């Protein structure tokens, strides 16, 4: 009884703002630090590529080699999302129900699961990366750059897993600024170490990888010190570390949609790279590395907004406050659409600026300028897709999230990558890039229709309960 009462005391004093504070003010309070963290994380993820692309003499090939590593890196991040972004919304919902014990049980189980996954991934990525990289589109010119990067990066898998996965539980509790600092610490250290290791120590791509895992280790220490400490409402405790199927399996089910979204990016990257290598050679694959980086720039702030809204929607859904759930979603939708439309305009007007950030090779800049306009032609619609996807997760709607993720990636995009070059035969390389906007347009339309039906059902269900 003492434990339960103490938990409620914390909840009432620290988390009641999720149920009472004006939605607009609250979304800003949570989303701005989360959004800042996502922007910092974007820099964190692409800073290696910016420096690598400017290595004298070998920058273009080195950039392409590191770009081929992206499928493996995305798989590592996807497993963090599977556990962290599956468990965190469920913990938030339980916090809304004032069940702190069950929420902490989820946190402990997710921590253990991420350690197990990290060990397995490290072994696979270290000993098998050359085979994967060749399959993912590396050529004889770029394979050694790719292997050099992954040999070092794979050793830091556990830091990536725990930083990304456990940070989701910090944000889900409403500690948005603390979550931002988790990313900021790593980003600052990475930005400082990159030029030292790459240029001053003449380590090239190996230096970029080493800087990344050191900075991730520092972020990991920050995240775990918070979740093991007394400032966190939910804490990692020894009695919750034993895996229990009824606890961890629903978390994995909810996180599966985000896992599919991120892991499928690696499959899609393989499809893009192999098709582009066939029709356009190394320059087309190098351009894809830049397009992927710009896409991260587009998506991460949207995900930051969604993650800022997630604790509000999840908490109030658990508390059966339908008006706040609905109000939060529509505010998220407006903000996300506004951002995606503005960024779409900038990319369409100034594609050479975005391309020039990543490479000083003029031939690659010119090629990427055209590819960017094709690849991101319907980016203005991304706000709808991300808002609906994050809302599905916030409400614990695992099946709907999975359907949306599978629809866009596997049903639409992958087949289109191979179909489009046979339809637009005059420029088959650009036809490969065109698969992205065609798939996006159809997927967003499908998601909006499905969400409008499911959202009404979810709200009606808690009104009747």
Segments from the language model and where they lie:
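Transmembrane helix-bundle signature of multi-pass secondary active exporters and lipid flippases
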Residues: 35-89, 153-160, 249-316, 336-344, ...
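Juxtamembrane/transmembrane-helix interface segments of polytopic membrane transporters
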Residues: 41, 45, 49, 53, ...
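Transmembrane alpha-helix boundary and packing residues in multipass membrane permease domains
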Residues: 34, 38, 50, 89, ...
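Short alpha-helical transmembrane segments in multi-pass integral membrane proteins
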Residues: 1-31, 91-156, 200-255, 313-378, ...
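Short loop-to-helix capping motifs
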Residues: 139, 175-176, 204, 281, ...
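Short runs within selected transmembrane alpha-helices of multi-pass transporters and secretion channels
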Residues: 84, 153-171, 182-187, 208-221, ...
């Amino acid at each position: 009884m003492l434990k339960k009462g103490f938990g409620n005391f914390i909840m009432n004093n620290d988390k009641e703002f999720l149920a009472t504070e004006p939605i607009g003010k609250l979304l800003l309070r949570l989303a701005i630090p989360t959004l800042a963290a996502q922007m910092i994380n974007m820099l964190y993820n692409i800073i290696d590529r910016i420096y690598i692309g400017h290595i004298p003499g070998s920058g273009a090939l080195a950039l392409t080699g590191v770009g081929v590593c992206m499928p493996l890196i995305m798989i590592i991040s996807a497993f963090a999302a599977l556990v962290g972004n599956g468990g965190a919304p469920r913990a938030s919902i339980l916090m809304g129900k004032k069940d702190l014990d069950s929420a902490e049980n989820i946190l402990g189980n997710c921590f253990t699961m991420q350690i197990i996954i990290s060990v397995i991934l490290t072994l696979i990525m270290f000993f098998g990366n050359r085979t994967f990289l060749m399959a993912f589109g590396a050529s004889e010119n770029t394979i050694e750059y790719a292997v050099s990067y992954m040999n070092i990066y794979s050793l830091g898998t556990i830091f990536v897993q725990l930083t990304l996965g456990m940070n989701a539980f910090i944000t889900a509790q409403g500690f948005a600024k603390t979550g931002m600092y988790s990313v900021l610490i790593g980003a600052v250290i990475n930005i400082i170490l990159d030029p030292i290791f790459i240029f001053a120590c003449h380590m090239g791509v190996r230096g970029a990888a080493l800087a990344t895992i050191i900075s991730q280790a520092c972020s990991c220490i920050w995240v775990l010190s918070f979740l093991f400490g007394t400032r966190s409402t939910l804490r990692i405790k020894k009695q919750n570390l034993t895996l229990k199927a009824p606890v961890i399996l629903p978390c994995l089910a909810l996180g599966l949609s985000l896992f599919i979204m991120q892991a499928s990016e690696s499959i899609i990257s393989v499809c893009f790279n192999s098709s582009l290598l066939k029709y356009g050679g190394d320059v087309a694959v190098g351009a894809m590395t830049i397009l992927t980086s710009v896409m991260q720039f587009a998506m991460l702030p949207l995900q930051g907004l969604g993650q800022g809204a997630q604790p509000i929607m999840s908490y109030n859904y658990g508390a059966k406050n339908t008006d706040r759930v609905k109000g939060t979603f529509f505010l998220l939708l407006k903000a996300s659409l506004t951002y995606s439309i503005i960024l779409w305009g900038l990319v369409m007007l100034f594609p050479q600026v975005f391309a020039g950030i990543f490479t000083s090779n003029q031939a690659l800049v010119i090629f990427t300028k055209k590819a960017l306009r094709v690849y991101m032609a319907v980016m203005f619609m991304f706000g709808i897709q991300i808002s609906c996807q994050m809302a599905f997760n916030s409400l614990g709607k695992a099946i709907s999230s999975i359907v949306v993720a599978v629809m866009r990636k596997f049903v639409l995009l992958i087949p289109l990558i191979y179909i489009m070059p046979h339809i637009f035969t005059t420029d088959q390389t650009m036809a490969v890039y065109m698969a992205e906007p065609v798939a996006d347009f159809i997927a967003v339309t499908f998601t909006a229709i499905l969400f409008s039906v499911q959202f009404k059902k979810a709200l009606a269900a808690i009104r009747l309960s």
